[in-house]
Amino acid sequence: MDTSEGIYFVRHNNRAVLATIRRDGSPQQSPVTVGLVDEAIVMSTRETAYKVRNLRRDPRAWLCVVTDGWYGQWVQLSCTTEVVSLPDAMDGLVAYYRALSGEHPDWGDYRRAMVEDQRCLVRFTVLAAGPDVAG
């Protein structure tokens, strides 16, 4: 599967399991919501999350993206990542929200919540994609 096909799959499927690498080399997995902003895969998370600590140490990551129904087609994406912290992350966090949910009723409130929750943005660069499997 071409990487562009894997990225296209995310346009219509936002549920994923993210795998990062712990300090001891074992996998750490988290259910996440990914979105597509300017043809790049992104997600929002907390600065204090283990996945962020892992990605800052080792930027390799794997996403298993699934449909909303869970069973059916899925795609695995091998990636490198960039963690963007506030305040630099704010525009990306707004774009992420818009990509998934449209307009927010109070953008000021949203921005305050991002600061209070210590949110950051993770950008994924897809290196390989596949297989596209139904199961």
Q: Model-derived features: where do they sit?
A:
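Generic structural signal for secondary-structure transition and capping sites
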Residues: 14-15, 60, 105, 129
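AMP-binding (ANL) adenylation modules
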Residues: 68-70
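Short beta-strand segments
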Residues: 14-47, 53, 61-65, 74-76
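Structural motif corresponding to alpha-helix initiation and N-cap regions
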Residues: 3-4, 48-49, 107-108
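Alpha-helix boundary recognition
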Residues: 8-11, 56-57, 115
